[in-house]
């Protein structure tokens, strides 16, 4: 059964982070799982039945009102604020908890579905580092065609599934 772990700030303030798998302080690897619009953190954690990797902790932040941002992922970035920035901060918050527990980014994956995939992919693009992997299930980078994508860093060594 998922457990409440930590809350986030911003428009998603007061929303829990649910956990499945190993306790965070005992895990060797982590997967941050980001739910889609209209779904819940508990819904995305249902995938852990299939993923079920020994030594993994699965962490899923919950969006306020079950949506990370109000418009389509192809809408102008400004029209998805403040939810977009708050959602990105929620992912950063979960990753900070994972790092504090001693799990390196190289052993941390991000997985998102639909709107959650868009948010996870956008986070990784803006915060390029050597993650353990990224899986974007039915999603893409946020913003219309022509949105500047000159983010610093590289994702060359990251396993990606999108």
Question: Model segments located where?
Answer:
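The feature captures the conserved acid-bearing segment of alpha/beta-hydrolase catalytic domains
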Residues: 140-162
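Hydrolases whose catalytic domains are alpha/beta-hydrolase-1, hotdog thioesterase
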Residues: 119-123, 145
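Active-site signature of alpha/beta-hydrolase-fold catalytic machinery across serine-
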Residues: 46, 122-126
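Serine-hydrolase catalytic machinery in alpha/beta-hydrolase-like enzymes
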Residues: 5-107
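A conserved short beta-strand
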Residues: 129-142
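Alpha/beta-hydrolase-fold catalytic nucleophile elbow
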Residues: 61-62, 111, 135-138
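Gly/Ala-rich beta-loop-alpha elbow adjacent to hydrolase catalytic centers
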Residues: 111-116, 120
């Amino acid at each position: 059964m998922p457990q409440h772990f930590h809350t986030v700030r911003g428009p998603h303030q007061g929303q829990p982070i649910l956990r499945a798998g190993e306790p965070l302080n005992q895990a060797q690897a982590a997967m941050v799982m980001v739910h889609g619009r209209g779904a819940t953190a508990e819904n995305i954690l249902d995938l852990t039945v299939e993923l079920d990797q020994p030594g993994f902790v699965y962490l899923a932040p919950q969006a306020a009102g079950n949506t990370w941002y109000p418009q389509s992922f192809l809408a102008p970035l400004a029209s998805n604020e403040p939810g977009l920035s708050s959602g990105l901060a929620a992912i950063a918050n979960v990753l900070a908890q994972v790092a504090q527990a001693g799990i390196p980014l190289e052993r941390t994956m991000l997985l998102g579905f639909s709107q959650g995939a868009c948010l996870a992919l956008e986070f990784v693009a803006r915060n390029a580092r050597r993650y353990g992997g990224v899986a974007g299930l039915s999603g893409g980078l946020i913003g219309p065609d022509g949105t500047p994508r000159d983010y610093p860093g590289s994702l060359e060594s990251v396993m990606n599934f999108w």
